[in-house]
Regions:
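C-terminal structural segment of proteins
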Residues: 1-265
């Protein structure tokens, strides 16, 4: 539960930024509020961005652009998303809780918060996505994921180059709608591979050694083993570190094999 003292609907991004800068410690940018309601918090000023048109999915200037207020369910249903990258973005979110939840949860909420359990950030990393911030401008998602959360900025959109790359996503869950125990995503463009692993349970990261194995033709199994050895894995209520390490080898191998099959088609 959370308590809000002042709830505002800015009409422009400039107004939203000005409101946020008044007090970045107690002001909060609202998304779908799916995760915010899980804790207990007093919010001095809640800034609702729903009137700013950030819920659009566009293809322009050679990029697929996902507004920060785009819902996860839109990723499953929008033709511009489902027809690209072998539908990886719709696939990666399809097991998250249920459709009513995915109709509320947003791209911005998942990406900006850098949740370790986020299926979406894992998939986006494999697609070489970038984020666009109001103050910080455009930067690679990998760089954004590695940085501390800055509550004085606003995420506007996520951009993915519409380059026709093939992609695949794999995850293991204790139940169908649970958070992932581990997740892996792989993409390939002109023989160059990108591999990412999420829910370690830390934030999703790129795995360069696994990508190198695929680039050098060492095969999917070698890539999986490289991912298991390069990255660190932790223990939480869903799984132990050793189990996650074993899962990484399997899921990276499976995603790589799936992507290889797609490349043959």
């Amino acid at each position: 539960m959370f308590t809000i003292k002042s709830y505002v609907f800015p009409e422009t991004l400039e107004e939203a930024d000005e409101l946020l800068q008044r007090d970045t410690r107690t002001s909060v940018i609202l998304g779908g509020c799916c995760w915010l309601k899980m804790g207990r918090r007093r919010i001095s000023r809640a800034i609702d961005l729903t009137r700013l048109g950030l819920d659009q999915i566009d293809v322009k200037d050679g990029y697929l652009e996902l507004g920060a207020s785009v819902t996860l369910h839109q990723l499953e249903t929008h033709p511009a998303v489902t027809s690209r990258f072998d539908g990886i973005l719709g696939e990666c979110v399809s097991h998250i809780v249920g459709v009513p939840f995915r109709n509320c949860a947003t791209v911005g909420g998942s990406v900006f918060s850098r949740f370790g359990f986020s299926d979406l950030t894992c998939a986006l990393l494999s697609l070489d996505a970038t984020v666009v911030l109001y103050r910080g401008g455009e930067l690679p998602l990998a760089e954004f994921m590695a940085s501390p959360i800055a509550f004085n900025d606003i995420l506007l959109k996520v951009r993915i180059k519409d380059d026709g790359r093939r992609a695949a996503y794999q995850s293991v869950r204790r139940s169908t709608t649970d958070f992932p125990t581990l997740a892996a995503a792989v993409s390939c463009l002109n023989g160059q591979w990108t591999v990412s692993v999420g829910a370690r349970p830390a934030r999703a990261v790129r795995c360069e050694s696994a990508a190198a194995c695929l680039n050098e033709g060492k095969g999917a199994a070698a890539a999986g083993q490289a991912a298991a050895e390069e990255l660190t894995y932790g223990t939480d209520l869903r799984a132990g570190a050793d189990y996650r390490k074993k899962l990484a080898a399997v899921l990276v191998r499976r995603a790589s094999e799936q992507c290889m099959e797609e490349n043959k088609g």
